[in-house]
Amino acid sequence: MSAIYNFCAGPAMLPAAVMKKAQQELLDWNGQGVSVMEISHRSKEFIALTEQAESDLRELMQIPANYHVLFMHGGGRGQFSAVVNNFLGEQGKALYLVSGQWSSAALAEAQKLAGEAQIDSLNIVEKHNGLNAVVLPDLHKIDADYRYVHYCPNETVDGIEIFDELDSPWPIVADLSSTIMSREIDVSRYGLIYAGAQKNIGPSGLSIVIVRDDMLKLPSLPQSSIMDYRLAVEHDSMFNTPPTFAWYLAAEVFAWLKSTGGISSIAKINQQKAQMLYQCIDGNAFYRNGVVAANRSQMNVTFQLVNEALDSEFLKQAQIAGLVALKGHRIVGGMRASLYNAMPLDGIVALVKFMNEFAAKHS
């Protein structure tokens, strides 16, 4: 069977080595004679798995000791509400930086739960010569007392990424769903990091939360117990039955990433993949991208065919060539190639070859 390269934005492809190992262990995990999906989450064997998973993630991301690592339900959208309910209290205010679809969704959820009076926002994307560009504000010049400032460093729908570290006088809450472990960051700069698993960690249904200890002292609002960070810390992420199979696969992805050289190594590969694809787009008048070079996403490359009438044919022929899930988000249209950690360099080579051949044929 010819290679299939899955460019889906999420749920995204998983490393082939992880998938093969899961396949081999599906009916008999760790010599138990049953699947990992069938054992108690409180068994010593599964507890050992969770401890190793946290240890590997801490090592990969160099997470300081004063941070808790939580494996929770709900995905990224679940955390939109959890952040508000855990940190805002009845009187607190927060600032949301809006750079695209996902930060807008987080803002809308915060305003729904807390009311617009408690939630301020700033649009940080401007047009520069017709292209989207991020302009980070000087937050130190804002006269306000916020519990936290929220932002999304990578917008998967819009193809926008913020590479500069945010400088804030208030705790930073970041949605890293699409960039976690794709490049190195300084975790100590953040009050809380959250990430839906289905892009760079594992299957959907799991979210990772990395929260600094002092954040748990902020006033909270009444909320569901399963989204209460304090209860999650107290119960080692097992206040209720966790998504065990997703946790198992996340553990395998962490181990795989360590075996490939860690985040510093995969970051170089990710940069190379993105550069190859953007060079193809920029070097061919057949395609265009709407983001300034400094803010082009490494994880989610969005592009359009100049002749949009060829979109359907492009997708059809790409599918035949084994290049799947290239259709852009319904809100923005066009094309999108998601280049998460599991996407091999060969996938980009194949995509670039196809794009060049398609352009030559239809120009």
From Swiss-Prot:
Residues the record lists as binding L-glutamate: 42
Free-text remark on how the cofactor is bound: Binds 1 pyridoxal phosphate per subunit.
Principal location listed in the UniProt entry: cytoplasm
Keywords, in A-Z order: Amino-acid biosynthesis, Aminotransferase, Cytoplasm, Pyridoxal phosphate, Pyridoxine biosynthesis, Serine biosynthesis, Transferase
Cross-referenced InterPro entries: Aminotrans_V_dom, Aminotrans_V_PyrdxlP_BS, Pser_aminoTfrase, PyrdxlP-dep_Trfase, PyrdxlP-dep_Trfase_major, PyrdxlP-dep_Trfase_small
Residues involved in pyridoxal 5'-phosphate binding: 76-77, 102, 156, 175, 198, 240-241
Gene Ontology annotations of biological process type: L-serine biosynthetic process; pyridoxine biosynthetic process
GO terms for cellular component: cytoplasm
Reactions mediated catalytically: O-phospho-L-serine + 2-oxoglutarate = 3-phosphooxypyruvate + L-glutamate; 4-(phosphooxy)-L-threonine + 2-oxoglutarate = (R)-3-hydroxy-2-oxo-4-phosphooxybutanoate + L-glutamate
N6-(pyridoxal phosphate)lysine modification, residue list: 199
Xref: Pfam families: Aminotran_5 (PF00266)
SUPFAM superfamilies for the chain: PLP-dependent transferases (SSF53383)
Pathway this chain belongs to: Amino-acid biosynthesis; L-serine biosynthesis; L-serine from 3-phospho-D-glycerate: step 2/3; Cofactor biosynthesis; pyridoxine 5'-phosphate biosynthesis; pyridoxine 5'-phosphate from D-erythrose 4-phosphate: step 3/5
Gene Ontology molecular functions: O-phospho-L-serine:2-oxoglutarate aminotransferase activity; pyridoxal phosphate binding
Entry EC no(s): 2.6.1.52
Entry annotated with the keyword Cytoplasm: yes
Presence of the UniProt keyword Transferase in the record: yes
Cofactor(s) listed in the protein's UniProt record: pyridoxal 5'-phosphate
Complexes and interactors: Homodimer.
HAMAP family, alphabetized: SerC_aminotrans_5
Family: Belongs to the class-V pyridoxal-phosphate-dependent aminotransferase family. SerC subfamily.
Protein name as annotated: Phosphoserine aminotransferase
